[in-house]
Each structure stands twice: as C-alpha cells, then as structure tokens.
Amino acid sequence: MAATTAADAFPSTVSSDSDSDDLLLPNLLPSTTAAPAPSSPSREQLHHFQIPSLPSPITVRALPSRGLSFQLWPSASTLLRVLPATPCLLPRPPAPGSPLSVLELGSGTGAAGLALAAALPARAVLSDLPDALPNLRHNVELNEHLLASAGGAASVVPLRWGDASAMADVAVAQTASPFDLVVAADVVYYEELVDPLIETLRFFVKGKVAFVMAHMRRWKRTDKKFFGRARKLFDVEVVHEDPPLEGWRHGPVVYRFTAKKQHGKK
C-alpha cells in the first residue's frame, strides 16, 4: 500500500461512510516470522511467498508500526498469485532475453512487484513516496539473487502520484525499455488521493500498456469516485475475484484497465 501525503493513520473524516468496516484487514499470508517478541508492537515481520515456478520463496520485510506503507495487505498476495498464472492478462508474453517492463505504483513492501519480477520474469520498477523507499530497497536486496536467477530484476524510484515532473523522470529513465504493464495492490483508500492516482494512470496507461490492480473494497464513497473517473478514461474489466476473507464481506478483486480508443484512431 502506498505512502500518502497525509499522516499514516486511519482517517476519521470518512468514518461516516456506511461501508467502512473493511479498512483494517488481517494479514492472511502463508508464512510469517516476526522478531523480537510477539508482544512488541514495533517488531518487524518477514513474509514469505512460495510461487510454483520459483525454487525459493519471495521474502519481504514489513514494519507495521511505521504505518500503512510498511504493512502487507491481502490484495498484494492475490495479485502476485493471480497475474503469473494468467498469461492472458499480460500485454505480451515474456521472451528469453526480453522480460516484461513493469511499473508498480504504491509498492509499499514491494511484495507484488518483486514476485512478478521473478515469476514472469520482468524488470520491475517499484515506486512509492520517499519514506517507504529504504524498506523497499531492503526487500529488493533480500531477493536480488532469486530475481537474477529467474531472469528478472527490480529497482526502486520515488513517485508521488500526479506529480508531472516525477512521472516524466520515471518515464525518461525507461526510454530504452518502455513499460509494458502497470500494477498496483490496495491503492484506493484515501479519497483525496483518487485524482492524483487517476492522473498517474492517465500518464502511464496508454496504447497497449495495461494496468492490473488488485483491490479490496473499503469505502463506498472512495470506490465510487475512483471507478467513476477511471471508467471515463479506461475500459475496466473484472478478471478475478477471491472469496470473502474470513470475517469480512469482501475478498480482493483483480481488475484490468486499458486505455479507451479515441474516436478516429485505431
């Protein structure tokens, strides 16, 4: 989940929404280790994701006490499981010596982006706000040998949604290998970030570039605003739905966004 322009705390200003009970979600993950002690609120957590095509698991460090950007969320697990197993969602098949070029928005811990880099394989650019980058770089280092052995790679860049200069810098750095795919997990949560996120998608998701997003419903108003704006610019399809998580009314849903064709253009 991305770092935000506001403090990493759950917003009281939107608590009047009638469907707000899914904001705090359990980290329902296959394998987790934590240190130093279970009672410590500041402990780091190591999460491990075993992907069938890889010889060893992807490992990421989460730091829950640091805020939303440092936690692991259910949609990331869904995205890293579904996308490698569903080749039809990819804009092109990876080829030997020609991995996909992938941008992850709001990377948080980088779990999804790192897993995709190894499993597709891909050259993944993981992006978030500056405070999240040290932990992202740490997680890239944890997995760099696994990624390299699979033919993938990952790098980390700062990217504030809607910042034209920052977006241009990311695009220019990829001139030799333009992005094929943009991905994200659990990035629709604060209403004030909807417009910057839409502007970021408008910038990167063009032509044959697709955006694949795993999303967990939390706030009716925020979802309505995001999908209403998105459908004016993109064709949006549901490509996968997980069953509801235990104790919750919804499970993660995977969407695929492609740019609407302009009239008169093929």
Regions found by a protein language model. Give the residues of each.
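S-adenosylmethionine-dependent methyltransferases
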Residues: 1-266
